[in-house]
C-alpha cells in the first residue's frame, strides 16, 4: 500500500494562511524511495521536501497560492513507483511529479508521465532518465548524470598515471548505466578495463568478485554502488588487503555509507556534489552560499547534516516552484519553463537546462573528495 505524506499550508503563520485562503492550491507530487533498498537516498529527500514546502507556505506559497505536496513511498519498487505516479496524476491532479530517488524507479515512471503530459523531475543519476531528449520531452533530473561522474573518475585516474582498472557495479539500472558510461569514458582517457564484475544489491559479501580483482593486473578499482552494498564491498576490499586506490561514485554521498563502512571508508575517493565539502570551498564558488544555507536550515530542523541526495530533492522542488511561479497552473507551460531555466544556482550545481539537455549540469558541478578520519576532504 502506498503511504502518503501531505504537506500544505496548515503550518503557515495566520496572516499568510489568510491570504492563501482565497486562492486555489498548487499541487505537486513526489514519489520517493523512503523504504526498501534505496531508503538511505529517499529518507533525506522526504525530509528536505517536507522542510521546503513548510517554509514556502510560511512565506505565502507560489504567487499567493498555497502548495500541497503529496509524498508517496514507492518502497524502492518499480511497480510501486508506477502506481504512485498514476495516483498523483489521476487523483491528486498534480502539476508536476518529483522523483524517484533511484534510477530504476525513475525509469519505470517515465512512460506514465509522458503519456499523461506531466512534467517529471527525477532525483536519480542514470543518463537514460533524460536521454535521448527527443524521447524524454516531459522528463528532467537534478542528480549529476553518470556520464559526468564517469568522466570525472576517468580523468582523475589518468592524471594519476593509472592505466589498468577493475570495474565492479550493482546489477541494477544505476550500476548498468554507470558501466555503459564508464566503458566510454575509460578508453577516451587512455584507461583499460581489465575486469568488469557485477553484484546484486542484496548481496552480503563481494569477496569472490574482489578476489578476481586481486588476481588481475588492475592498478585501481572503481565501484558503482549505493549503501549498503557500497559499504559492504568497501569492507571486503580492506579485508582482502587490496593495495590500490578504491574509487566510488556520488552514490555514497551520505552518512549511511560512512556509518556502515566505518574505518574501511577512509581512503575512498569519489566525485561528489559540493555539498559534502561546502565549508572547504573557496568563497568565490557560486554555490557556496546556497549550500551553507541548506545545511543550516536542515541542521536546525532535523539536527543532522543533509546528504547529497537531499540536495537533489532540494533542487527538484525549487526548480518546480520556479517553473510554476513563471508559468502558472499549466503543465505544458511548466515544462517549457523548466526547459528554459538557465543559471539556476542549486545544491547539485548551477543548472543550465535546454531543449538539448534536461539535466543541465557539467563536470564543474562535482569535485573529487577523499574520506579521511571519517570525514569528506576536498582534493581539488
Tell me the role of every PLM-derived stretch.
Residues 1-27, 58, 380:
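Short, low-complexity disordered leader/linker segments with a strong preference
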Residues 13-16, 25, 40-47, 59-130, ...:
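Beta-alpha junction/loop-to-helix N-cap segments that form part of ligand/metal-binding clefts
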Residues 22, 26-50, 72-79, 101-102, ...:
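Extracytoplasmic "Venus flytrap"
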Residues 24-27, 64-68, 91-96, 115-120, ...:
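Loop/turn elements at helix/coil->beta-strand transitions in domains of secreted/extracellular proteins
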Residues 83, 128-129, 137-241, 284-285:
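Extracellular/periplasmic Venus flytrap/periplasmic-binding protein
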Residues 88-101, 121-123, 166-169, 217-227, ...:
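Periplasmic-binding protein-like
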Residues 234-312, 375-378:
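Extracellular/periplasmic periplasmic-binding protein-like sensory domains
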Residues 297-310, 321-375:
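Segments of small-molecule ligand-sensing domains
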Amino acid at each position: 500500500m502506498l503511504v502518503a505524506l501531505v504537506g500544505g499550508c496548515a503550518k503557515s503563520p495566520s496572516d499568510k494562511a489568510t491570504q492563501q485562503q482565497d486562492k486555489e492550491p498548487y499541487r505537486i507530487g513526489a514519489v520517493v524511495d523512503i523504504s526498501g533498498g534505496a531508503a538511505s537516498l529517499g529518507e533525506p529527500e522526504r525530509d528536505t521536501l517536507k522542510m521546503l514546502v513548510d517554509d514556502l507556505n510560511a512565506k505565502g506559497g507560489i504567487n499567493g497560492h498555497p502548495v500541497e505536496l503529496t509524498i508517496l513511498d514507492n518502497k524502492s519498487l518499480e511497480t510501486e513507483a508506477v502506481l504512485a505516479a498514476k495516483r498523483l496524476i489521476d487523483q491528486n491532479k498534480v502539476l508536476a511529479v518529483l522523483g524517484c530517488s533511484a534510477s530504476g524507479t525513475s525509469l519505470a515512471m517515465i512512460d506514465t508521465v509522458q503519456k499523461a503530459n506531466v512534467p517529471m523531475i527525477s532525483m536519480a543519476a542514470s543518463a537514460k532518465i533524460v536521454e535521448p531528449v527527443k524521447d524524454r520531452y516531459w522528463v528532467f533530473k537534478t542528480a549529476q548524470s553518470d556520464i559526468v561522474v564517469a568522466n570525472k573518475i576517468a580523468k582523475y585516474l589518468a592524471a594519476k598515471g593509472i592505466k589498468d582498472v577493475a570495474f565492479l557495479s550493482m546489477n541494477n539500472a544505476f550500476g548498468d548505466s554507470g558501466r555503459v558510461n564508464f566503458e566510454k569514458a575509460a578508453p577516451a582517457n587512455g584507461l583499460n578495463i581489465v575486469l568488469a564484475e557485477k553484484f546484486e544489491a542484496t548481496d552480503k559479501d563481494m569477496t569472490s568478485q574482489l578476489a578476481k580483482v586481486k588476481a588481475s593486473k588492475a592498478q585501481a578499482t572503481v565501484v558503482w554502488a549505493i549503501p549498503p552494498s557500497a559499504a559492504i564491498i568497501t569492507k571486503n576490499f580492506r579485508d582482502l588487503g587490496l593495495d590500490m586506490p578504491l574509487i566510488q561514485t556520488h552514490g555514497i554521498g551520505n552518512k549511511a555509507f560512512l556509518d556502515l563502512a566505518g574505518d574501511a571508508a577512509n581512503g575512498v575517493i569519489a566525485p561528489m556534489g559540493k555539498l559534502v565539502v561546502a565549508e572547504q570551498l573557496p568563497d568565490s564558488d557560486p554555490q557556496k552560499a546556497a549550500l551553507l544555507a541548506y545545511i543550516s536550515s536542515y541542521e536546525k530542523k532535523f539536527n543532522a547534516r543533509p546528504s547529497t541526495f537531499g540536495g537533489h530533492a532540494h533542487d527538484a522542488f525549487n526548480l518546480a516552484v520556479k517553473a510554476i511561479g513563471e508559468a502558472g497552473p499549466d503543465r505544458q507551460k511548466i515544462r517549457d519553463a523548466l526547459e528554459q531555466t538557465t543559471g539556476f544556482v542549486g545544491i547539485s550545481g548551477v543548472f543550465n537546462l535546454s531543449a538539448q539537455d534536461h539535466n543541465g549540469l557539467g563536470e564543474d558541478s562535482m569535485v573529487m573528495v577523499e574520506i579521511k578520519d571519517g570525514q569528506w576532504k576536498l582534493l581539488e
